[in-house]
Amino acid sequence: MSTIYDHAGSLRRMGNDPELFHEMVELLRTDAPTLLSAVQSADREGDPPRLQRAAHTLKGLSANFGAERAVAAAGEVERLAKARQSGGLPAAITELEESLDELIAALAPSPQMSGSS
């Protein structure tokens, strides 16, 4: 089983700056739900360019963490939107939702990190 994200690789990509890492985690936590909502509404409204842009942004956010499953899922949504192949979108969007939920949960601070007693 592969890991959900690559912590060491993420830190390297962020200049070994733990503060930047935590800022990027917060960015993902705040932006991913908004972008996922944009993916869902663009799909419902039949707006492939908007769907493609939102999926592309989610792919980039996920790539910051080396989250292969989320990157692949966002890439598939982006590819389907670009090709205007709506038939595979429901399953691809579900996979994207699940992989982002998994990533965000994996990035949640542990009790030791949060400073709780």
PLM region spans:
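Two-component system phosphorelay core
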Residues: 1-117
